[in-house]
Regions:
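Sec-dependent signal peptide recognition
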Residues: 2-10
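Short hydrophobic/aromatic segments of transmembrane alpha-helices and their interfaces
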Residues: 3, 59-61, 65-66, 245-246, ...
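Sec/Tat signal peptide C-region and signal peptidase I cleavage site
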Residues: 15-20
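Outer-membrane beta-barrel porins/channels
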Residues: 21-53, 134-420
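Short glycine/proline- and aromatic-enriched beta-strand/turn motifs that initiate or cap beta-hairpins
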Residues: 21-69, 75, 84-109
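N-terminal functional module of multi-domain proteins
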Residues: 64-67, 74-190, 199
Length: 420
């Protein structure tokens, strides 16, 4: 009897391993086939989603000195300021326009969802699948995200941590994208309040975990068993960023070099794991450390992001009732590749430019507007002393050139912090 039990257990383990291996092979094949189309943002490290910048068309590299910008502009470490964020939380919902716009039948997706719920879709969630599938469309897109961050600046030293979870879609399927990023850096500044040069350098540990793509129907009928058998790719990279900024009275200019890969540390190496194995494999700090070592040594998939050069200029009156104007050019190094690929010069250049303005009406109220790759954005913030609330309705370009794949979103952030 003991032998029979042993053989049975061995068969069960073998079958489960074969099943998991098959699932992982399919997942890896999907990554290879759609690396640049559907998974590029998931494979790369965390990029800050700052409603202040979103409301200004994605611009503000030279003037945005919030703790969020520590993830994208290390030169803020040369300002010599002290700042705490404990914490900030951001919620973003996409496809807002698609949700409320009227179709050929005179009804919006929101109208159809409300009607379906009244007719019993709450009991049969599958009735909502066609509506949701039509809403997210084809190609790559995002549905919603939540994130939280904490951080501090202490003169020339800064550190921050961010957790972001985004539900993405690609060709009618959906998948979860979780990112955890910790950044630490040093900077220095030369000059005074009117004329100043700031330089900063940061290192980041970016941990990415994203699931295999599943159908909308499966996503809307999730249960514990389905979740436990869902495979995730999990990996991390350690990229470095450098930034320099120059201030001359009200004029400011900033340049950053991000995703610098030193000694291969910036390569993202991935292993694959089932959800049900997470609690058993990652149940302690030692276990996490051991798994992290295994991922780097025995990775099944590797992604190397390209280094990015960004530049921004701005005009900032630095007064409580003043105005800020900003213009950025992002990912400059990829522009020649896009032009060589045959894309139009106008579309490529417009797709890499961001511009915006911020008007401070009072000490506590700001209004923003801008153009993000040609799409109009707007936003604002209210400072209540103990908490700052930022909101933005924005459009962003998910394609290579302006006008290829626009996506809108509504973002709201609450920040409890102290600034000096």
């Amino acid at each position: 009897m003991k032998k029979i039990i042993t053989i049975a257990l061995a068969l069960i383990v073998s079958i489960s391993m074969v099943f998991a291996s098959s699932v992982f092979d399919d997942f890896k094949a999907d990554l290879v086939a759609n690396e640049s189309k559907g998974f590029a943002e998931s494979l790369e490290g965390y990029k800050p989603s700052n409603p202040q910048s979103m409301g200004m068309g994605g611009a503000g590299l030279a003037i945005n000195d919030s703790l969020d910008s520590l993830f994208s502009n290390p030169s803020i470490l040369g300002q010599g300021k002290v700042r705490f964020s404990i914490p900030s939380a951001t919620v973003t919902v996409n496809h807002v326009y698609d949700l409320v716009k009227k179709g050929e039948d005179g009804k919006s997706a929101l109208d159809k969802i409300q009607t379906a719920i009244k007719e019993g879709a709450a009991d049969n969630i599958s009735d909502l699948v066609p509506i949701v599938s039509s809403l997210i469309g084809t190609g790559k897109s995002k549905i919603a995200s939540v994130e939280a961050s904490v951080g501090m600046l202490a003169n020339v030293f800064g550190l921050a941590m961010n957790v972001n979870d985004t539900v993405r879609s690609f060709d009618g399927t959906v998948f979860d994208d979780l990112k955890i990023s910790a950044v630490m850096g040093l900077g220095f500044g030369i000059g005074n309040d009117d004329v100043r040069l700031n330089v900063g350098f940061t290192g980041k540990i970016n941990v990415n975990a994203f699931s295999k793509r599943i159908s909308v129907n499966d996503a809307m009928n999730f249960n514990e068993e389905t979740i436990n058998q869902l495979p995730f790719a999990i990996g991390y990279g350690i990229p470095f960023d450098a930034g320099v900024s120059l201030k001359f009275h009200s004029l400011k200019a900033t340049a950053t070099l991000t995703d610098i890969n030193i000694l291969g540390l910036g390569d993202y190496k991935y292993d694959m794991i089932l959800v049900e194995d997470v609690t058993t494999k990652l149940n302690s700090i030692d276990a996490i450390s051991g798994e992290a070592t295994k991922i780097r040594e025995n990775s099944v998939y590797q992604f190397t992001p390209k280094m990015k050069l960004n530049a921004g200029i701005a005009f900032d009156t630095e007064s409580s009732t003043g105005i800020k104007l900003a213009f950025d050019v992002v990912d400059i190094l990829s522009i020649p590749d896009a032009l060589d690929a045959g894309y139009s010069t106008k579309g490529v250049l417009l797709g890499h430019t961001k511009s915006g303005a911020e008007f401070s009406l009072f000490n506590f109220l700001k209004v923003r507007g801008g153009l993000n790759s040609g799409y109009f954005t707007l936003g604002g913030s209210v400072n209540l002393g103990f908490i700052t609330i930022d909101a933005a309705y924005f459009w962003e370009e998910l394609g290579v050139v302006a006008g290829e794949k626009g996506l809108d979103g509504l973002s709201l952030r609450f920040n409890i912090g102290w600034d000096n």
